[in-house]
Amino acid sequence: MAVSTSHFRSLCASSRSLSRTGIVAPISCRGYATTEPSPSATSTTTTTTARRRTTFKDKLNAGPSFADFVGNDNAPLDPSEAYALKTALVGPAGRKKEMTRLPSWLKTPIPDSKNYQRLKKDLRGLNLHTVCEEARCPNISDCWGGSDKSAATATIMLMGDTCTRGCRFCSVKTSRTPSPLDPHEPENTAEAISRWGLGYVVLTSVDRDDLADGGARHFAETVMKIKQKAPSILVECLTGDYAGDLEMVKLVARSGLDVYAHNVETVEALTPQVRDRRANFQQSIRVLEAAKNAQPSLITKTSLMLGLGETDEQLWDALRQLRVVNVDVVTFGQYMRPTKRHMAVHEYVTPDRFELWRQRALDMGFLYCASGPLVRSSYKAGEAFIENVLKKRRAASGSTETVGVRPVAVDEVTR
């Protein structure tokens, strides 16, 4: 064995001698019966190459030290400095583009809780869709992820996941010929909601201009199924405009729901640039007015996005028109561009300004206003307040049924 080991080492001697001259990189050779040579046993010299400097390392070395950071006695940033948007170069080398970073107040955690997974599994099992997923809502981790399931909120999207309209702010799929309605959807929706044990639920839908009634009867049937299975659940319906057919609006308003919501989305002047050409601000105002007239005890609700280029005067005008038709609740949220194919963000509105408009809305007489960068029309904080108001009304009337609402048959002709 010793002879074979010495013979093998002699074969590697030439390689080691060449490595000393720097011609060939050193090669470590071991026989099957040899042990790892110790550092002192080898005379090979290793050549180390200097690591390439990077832009990040240069910036890090040039920046403040930890001692500087801890001992900094500079005054706090004022609001304008704290809210200043930062930019970054994004893209491959040689083709980088300057992009505005998302403000810190718009960043949310990635959803991955047990409650989130449970809700998602139930929805998939019953072939149901939610606007939370389809519209890429930033609040999904908050609304679905709470440990208290009674506080969880999932906005069910009826009549499929494909819309017949193409609003320039919305990421929901569009088609002129979406799939037919699922006749089992009202029953499946009611079953899922009763299974979750929620106290408040939001129903919405895609626009279905391909249907004669715009899907109003399907919507109303779903509400009635829910009330049959769980009369105590409070139901909010966020509907479309049914192409201006106010009889269909009245049908849904009288189906037994508690809150009728329809979004004007933006101020009147920007509506043609923001919404589909088949929608308009005055038509939305008429929808909200018809719902309130059909069932005066209903809470009516709408929502506006900020950051689209609206002016203060345009916002004042929108709020005045909403109060004229007795809209009870309004919400303000930041428009966030879903993809590069959609409208660009004109402005990231600061939290302070959202608070200013919340106070202005309350001063104008709105029952409630949820206003903030991440607030959406079905934001659960607003629902908690509305739920409390409705429960107080029920307690005052001594009933567990929807106060002042008489559910009508789906095929009943409204007058």
Curated annotation (Swiss-Prot):
Its EC number is 2.8.1.8. Its main location: mitochondrion. The keyword Metal-binding applies. It comes from Neosartorya fischeri (strain ATCC 1020 / DSM 3700 / CBS 544.65 / FGSC A1164 / JCM 1740 / NRRL 181 / WB 181). GO terms for cellular component: mitochondrion. [4Fe-4S] cluster 1 binds at residues 132, 137, 143, 378. Residues 33-49 have a biased composition (Low complexity). The keyword Transcription regulation does not apply. This is Lipoyl synthase, mitochondrial.
